[in-house]
Amino acid sequence: MLKREMNIADYDAELWQAMEQEKVRQEEHIELIASENYTSPRVMQAQGSQLTNKYAEGYPGKRYYGGCEYVDIVEQLAIDRAKELFGADYANVQPHSGSQANFAVYTALLQPGDTVLGMNLAQGGHLTHGSPVNFSGKLYNIIPYGIDESGKIDYEDMAKQAETHKPKMIIGGFSAYSGVVDWAKMREIADSIGAYLFVDMAHVAGLIAAGVYPNPVPHAHVVTTTTHKTLAGPRGGLILAHGGNEELYKKLNSAVFPSAQGGPLMHVIAAKAVALKEAMEPEFKVYQQQVAKNAKAMVEVFLNRGYKVVSGGTENHLFLLDLVDKNLTGKEADAALGRANITVNKNSVPNDPKSPFVTSGIRIGSPAVTRRGFKEAEVKELAGWMCDVLDNINDEAVIERIKGKVLDICARFPVYA
């Protein structure tokens, strides 16, 4: 018999200490990594539930195990909410991650060796869009597209590459691009050569759900996303489609199970269902609008302080600082800001002379700070503090002073009150 009062603290002090330290770190550090966010206690309640005990290979109503009558309800709720939220008529909520979702799409639509047009990782793309170190770059013939001198996606070049190489699939989406993607234009290019358009909207799914960023679902053959990041749910993946192509939907389902995965994580699927319901609330739209406002407000401060922002601004939740002119590396900036309890990530910038392990830039995102209640006034102050640190990267007195301000504002805006 398992006793409900069993706990980690009394059993595994070493593990519990690390968990508690991470809890403190999240409360006392300002989180600006664009792909990170804080999920709600409701989501965590679902993830810590007895649903974790249940094997449920297959799909609702078509399971390989008995005893699935209640997890069927859970998964169907998640499916229905995903379809409603994004205007899709197909949803698969089983992928364990965004990368797993992407892998399933490749498996469903392509054969190894097929040509794929994807955004260059060094110019804002993602590992799974064709990086040579990733399965996508190893199994498929990847042709990269990128951005023009203004920092915007170069659709003219994309169309030329498509016409020249005749890819079977074109990938839209990004991990470090601050603009708005023209999904309709990408579909037009894909249709001109008979290619699939696959969009990975992981970074902007929350903005899309709230109507703050254009929805790719009406334009793409297939769309994937993570359920964390701007969507603020559990760590996991999701596949969506629209258009009624039942043959495609069957291929996608088979590519997830049994091709790529076995049993789904039912506790995580329940958490996805909760997060999708939260994303339908009016306050979620207000939150996403503030995410976009906060990113713009931060950009304004950095530009006024003489910092170069890739593309000169942002139209979503993130932006890149190009530190080449400041003679700083992304690695140095990341470390100095970290000492002031401000968490960012080093990131390559267009035509970066440094390696991906050093880089010449940092990526900054507003979802997490907005989640804890920061508005324009707070993020402008924060951006100023970041400039103070970057202007005095070797001055520990300045860094300590900023750290004190960070601790103060974190206490005033707790993540979990």
From Swiss-Prot:
InterPro entries (alphabetical): PyrdxlP-dep_Trfase, PyrdxlP-dep_Trfase_major, PyrdxlP-dep_Trfase_small, Ser_HO-MeTrfase, Ser_HO-MeTrfase-like, Ser_HO-MeTrfase_PLP_BS, SHMT-like_dom
A GO term, aspect molecular function: glycine hydroxymethyltransferase activity
Disulphide bridges: none
Localization terms from the record: Cytoplasm
Modified residues (N6-(pyridoxal phosphate)lysine): K229
Stretches of the chain forming a coiled coil according to its record: none
Substrates-to-products reaction catalysed: (6R)-5,10-methylene-5,6,7,8-tetrahydrofolate + glycine + H2O = (6S)-5,6,7,8-tetrahydrofolate + L-serine
GO biological process: one example: glycine biosynthetic process from serine
Binding site for (6S)-5,6,7,8-tetrahydrofolate: L121, G125, H126, L127, S355, P356, F357
PANTHER family: SERINE HYDROXYMETHYLTRANSFERASE
Function: Catalyzes the reversible interconversion of serine and glycine with tetrahydrofolate (THF) serving as the one-carbon carrier. This reaction serves as the major source of one-carbon groups required for the biosynthesis of purines, thymidylate, methionine, and other important biomolecules. Also exhibits THF-independent aldolase activity toward beta-hydroxyamino acids, producing glycine and aldehydes, via a retro-aldol mechanism.
Record's protein name: Serine hydroxymethyltransferase
Species of the source: Enterobacter sp. (strain 638)
Lineage: Bacteria, Pseudomonadati, Pseudomonadota, Gammaproteobacteria, Enterobacterales
Gene behind the chain: glyA
